[in-house]
Amino acid sequence: MSQIKLIVGLANPGTKYEDTRHNAGEWLINEIARQFNVSLKEEAKFFGKVAKINAAGGEVRLLVPTTFMNLSGKAVGALANFYRIKPEEILVAHDELDLPPGVAKIKQGGGHGGHNGLKDIIASLGNSNNFYRVRIGIGHPGSKELVAGYVLGKPSPQDQEKINAAVDEAGRCVDLLLKDGITKATNRLNAFKA
């Protein structure tokens, strides 16, 4: 596996959205920033909030785009081009409808599953979907028509507790991934259930 050089947390900007399900990716970046004791700072040229951490294999950038979700690729593309980071050196954390709250999984590649943030990132990386993902389960509202409102809604207190537990575990697994590689981290996170 390539060394991960960029970890992205997908979100919509502004306080109106910070507690919504669609911002679960940002919750993970905040957890990693806490672990490494760094603060994200707004960087206009990368259309996002950025921090740098030093992990076992070298420098890793953290990024939360401050564009809206469907323009996330603008931020990822700008930072990846500037630092010459390849798709397989990128880990994207995002909310996942197909996993229940309390579960998170690591995987490489795959489609966007209708997730507009992933769709835009794939396009911005020259149609490459070869990056890694941390899929943070938020559950599914049951019907396609309800999805748009659901992802922009706040989880129930019980679901939030489970999502927080999965985000905490994902944070520990990202640390493991940076130290020991993808396999150990994937096996550990994929077995977790809050």
From Swiss-Prot:
Gene3D superfamilies: Peptidyl-tRNA hydrolase. It catalyses: an N-acyl-L-alpha-aminoacyl-tRNA + H2O = an N-acyl-L-amino acid + a tRNA + H(+). PROSITE patterns: PEPT_TRNA_HYDROL_1, PEPT_TRNA_HYDROL_2. The record marks 95 as: Stabilizes the basic form of H active site to accept a proton. It is found in: Cytoplasm. It comes from the Bacteria. GO terms for biological process: protein quality control for misfolded or incompletely synthesized proteins; rescue of stalled ribosome. The active site is at residue 22. Its EC number is 3.1.1.29. GO terms for molecular function: peptidyl-tRNA hydrolase activity; tRNA binding. NCBIfam families: pth. Belongs to the PTH family. This is Peptidyl-tRNA hydrolase.
